[in-house]
UniProtKB/Swiss-Prot annotation:
One of its GO terms (cellular component) is chloroplast. InterPro entries: Domain_X, Maturase_MatK, Maturase_MatK_N. One of its GO terms (biological process) is tRNA processing. Keywords: Chloroplast, mRNA processing, Plastid, RNA-binding, tRNA processing. The keyword Signal does not apply. It is found in: Plastid, Chloroplast. Belongs to the intron maturase 2 family. MatK subfamily. One of its GO terms (molecular function) is RNA binding. The gene is matK. It comes from Nicotiana bigelovii (Bigelov's tobacco). It holds the Pfam family MatK_N. Its main location: plastid. This is Maturase K. PANTHER family: MATURASE K.
Length: 509
């Protein structure tokens, strides 16, 4: 009971963090206007005072200083007459949204740091490692090999802007900030301009991306946190009583009823959704829910999710947004990789006295491959090759120096090798490397008005060194004559924790 109360109870200190937009009033909307402030953001999160979290005094002084330099003020009474808007309407609306996003991100950052500090004996966990895209793959590699079915979910979007404001109402206790947010959303944008659904997942406009991503993540976080709580408590509650926990505002009035459910109805609890091997991952506007259970169980979860999100979070579900797939028979595009769980057959011979036995054993293995066709399509779109994969020159770079051209091609090659280092098979990467290297040679030959063969004879070693990856460079220095050592390294998978974004050439979509 105490665990449930701790989970759903809002931390008072976190509520207090949101009082400073009311204290600072209009000053907060100049916060994001200083380009150097984001680089020195730690000054807002460090305080030599009592709690070592943040300093109201430092923030107040910074905001006041920037406000005096910018000299602007919003007046909602004579909104149409105010010269603040005019031709710079988009510019100042972007300033407002970025300022609001910057302010509300601070308590969420503190909350993340405090939650991570509970790991490893109150030792501060390196949260930047969790930001890496590759940090998800070791989790999938360790867990998905033991699972059977997966729900591929395209996360829907809210049907009305007011839902986004209502979601923040649980955390932001400053009424003036919420009113300004509501006014801002309804004045400048409608839902179609906020979130576009032309492609799978979400596509935000380039303006105010930080603001929209915050609203979207806070909204999805609210859906996920309540859903995870209900999933964890599914073995203790009846399937008809979960609705009482969804309305956080009235939660404390229903605590006594919850105690009665635990005390009286435990013997007749329905175990419809009990599954200890359930894993959830969200990425790029999508999510996957994998289970070790049967098809019937995962199908129940499908209908449960649809009803849960539609009824209680007003999410708009369309046909085809959620699919059930068997892991052993299905490959999916996941963060630029083609991932699947395949059976790795092996044969074991056992001999007892004069009798021998052959035992066939199949082991599930999480497999990650480089999607060659989409990757060649990205190279063709960038004019490095044709759609069939034949290298061509890049005339746009012909005006650059030879060293700059070689450096650009080499950087693209190393970045692709770095991102796809977790691939089970590296043969595709060597084909991409061949395309980029020959495209570089054709570009240089075009610049010097010579043939590719002549240019490679003259500077072939320089091209070879520039296209070496970091692993190849280490091995070439350690084992200069043992070229076979490269094969052993590239047959293994390596996951890096310093990759925070996907380059267009590394994205399969």
């Amino acid at each position: 009971m105490e665990e449930i109360q701790r989970y759903l109870q809002l931390d008072r200190s976190q509520q207090h963090n949101f009082l400073y937009p009311l204290i600072f009033q209009e000053y907060i909307y100049a916060l994001a206007h200083d380009p150097g402030l984001n680089r020195n953001r730690s000054i807002l999160l460090e305080n030599p005072g009592s709690n070592n979290k943040f300093s109201f005094l430092i923030v107040k002084r910074l905001i006041t200083r920037m406000y005096q330099q910018n000299h602007f003020l919003i007046s909602t009474n004579d909104f149409n007459k105010n010269s603040f808007l005019g031709c710079n309407k988009n510019l100042y609306s972007q300033m407002i949204s970025e300022g609001f996003a910057f302010i509300v991100e601070i308590p969420f950052s503190l909350r993340l740091i405090s939650s991570l500090s509970s790991f490893e004996g109150k030792k501060i966990f390196k949260s930047h490692n969790l930001r890496s895209i590759h940090s998800t793959f070791p989790f999938l590699e360790d867990n998905f090999a033991h699972l059977n079915y997966v729900l591929d979910i395209l996360i829907p979007y809210p049907v009305h802007l007011e839902i986004l404001v209502q979601t923040l109402r649980y955390w932001v206790k400053d009424a003036s900030s919420l009113h300004l947010l509501r006014f801002f959303l309804h004045e400048y944008w409608n839902l179609n301009s906020l979130i576009t659904s032309k492609k799978p997942g979400y596509s935000f406009s380039k303006k105010n991306q930080r603001f929209f991503f915050f609203l979207y993540n806070s909204y999805v976080y609210e859906c996920e946190s309540t859903f995870v709580f209900l999933r964890n408590q599914s073995s203790h509650l009846r399937s008809t009583s979960f609705g009482a926990l969804l309305e956080r505002i009235f939660f404390y009035g229903k605590i006594e009823r919850l105690v009665e459910v635990f005390a009286k109805d435990f013997q007749v609890t329905l175990w419809l959704f009990k599954d200890p091997f359930m894993h959830y991952v969200r990425y790029q506007g999508k999510s996957i829910l994998a289970s070790k259970g049967t098809f019937l169980l995962i199908n129940k979860w499908k209908f449960y999710l649809v009803n849960f999100w539609q009824c209680h979070f007003s999410l708009c579900f369309h046909t085809g947004r959620i699919h059930i797939n068997q892991l052993s028979n299905h490959s999916r595009d996941f963060m630029g990789y083609l991932s699947s769980v395949r059976l790795n057959p092996s044969m074991v011979r056992s001999q007892m006295l004069e009798n021998s036995f052959l035992i066939n054993n199949a082991i599930k293995k999480f497999d990650t491959l480089v999607p060659i066709i989409p990757l060649i399509g990205s190279l063709a779109k960038a004019n490095f090759c044709t759609v069939l994969g034949h290298p061509i020159s890049k005339p746009v770079w012909s005006d650059l120096s030879d060293s700059d051209i070689i450096a650009r091609f080499g950087r693209i090659c190393r970045n692709l090798f770095h991102y796809y280092s977790g691939s089970s098979k590296k043969k595709t990467l060597y084909r991409i490397k061949y395309i980029l290297r020959l495209s570089c040679a054709r570009t240089l030959a075009r610049k010097h008005k010579s043939t590719v063969r002549t240019f490679l004879k003259r500077s072939g070693s320089e091209l070879l060194e520039e296209f070496l990856t970091s692993e190849e460079q280490v091995l070439s220095l350690t084992f200069p004559r043992a070229s076979s050592s490269l094969g052993g390294v590239y047959r293994s998978r390596i996951w890096y924790l310093d990759i925070f974004c996907i380059n267009d050439l590394a994205n399969s979509q």
